[in-house]
Amino acid sequence: MFGGIAIILYPQAASWFSQREQSRAIEAAQARLDEPPNNSSDARRAQLALAHAYNDALASGAIFEANANIATGGGSGADSPFVYEEILDLAGGGFMGRLRYDSLGIDLPIYHGTSDETLERGVGHLEGTSLPVGGVGTRSVLTAHRGLPEATLFDNLNQSEVGDSFTVAVLDQVLAYEVIDVQVVEPDQTQAILAVEDRDLVTLVTCTPLGINSHRILVTAERVTPTPVEDAEAATAVPDIPKFPWWSVILAVSFIALATFVWRSGIVRTDGAGEATPEPSESDEITDH
């Protein structure tokens, strides 16, 4: 019984530990950013300026591979000295920023690229699309897994609705976005993620249906300015997920119930074993006549 309950609760427990690690990653990255020389305003402004310059030089485009869990970049930068992996990487480890989508319970670190290793840790920025620093004529594409048994990432992205809001925090800036479009597309419909002139966009991407991954959910949002104060405060606050692990309470209660059952069963067996079997008397013996 206990083993069955443990199996049922495994996805919840694994997701809880994964969320805890993601929150710790955000806190650790923020701590590194608060240390010299990363806490220098000049250093941060220089990185943001470099990111904007990269976006200006970018020939935007991307390719989604059919039947794959991740998106792969097909865009390329114009001839330039930019090193993608080094831009916005003041915190180290490829950490780029933080995505917070409160209504879906998403609070995840954003990393460079979309390798398997990256997407096991959080959200990946699709190389070949704009870096998530905002700007007219840009579209940043952020992608994450959906349906992993050991982690909850973009699992709830299919519940996105027009009018939802989320934030992207990168270095000193917090950008707020409002969802304007939710659609499901074929992997080769790359025009759906191209930058649009005079618009500041972010598109969140994940695979669908679960376990098949033949299509992509695209959640596109447009920048809201200025960033609401409450959104800015939440985006820079200590992560508040995972929530209390109720699964651990269920597991503990189940274990106690099982232990109590085994203990009481042992008492009954012991009591029964202590009763002596009466010896047959002579009068009870069967004789032949």
Where are these regions (language model features)?
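C-terminal single-pass membrane-anchor helix
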Residues: 234-289
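Solvent-exposed, non-transmembrane regions of membrane-associated and secreted proteins
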Residues: 1-243, 271-274, 278
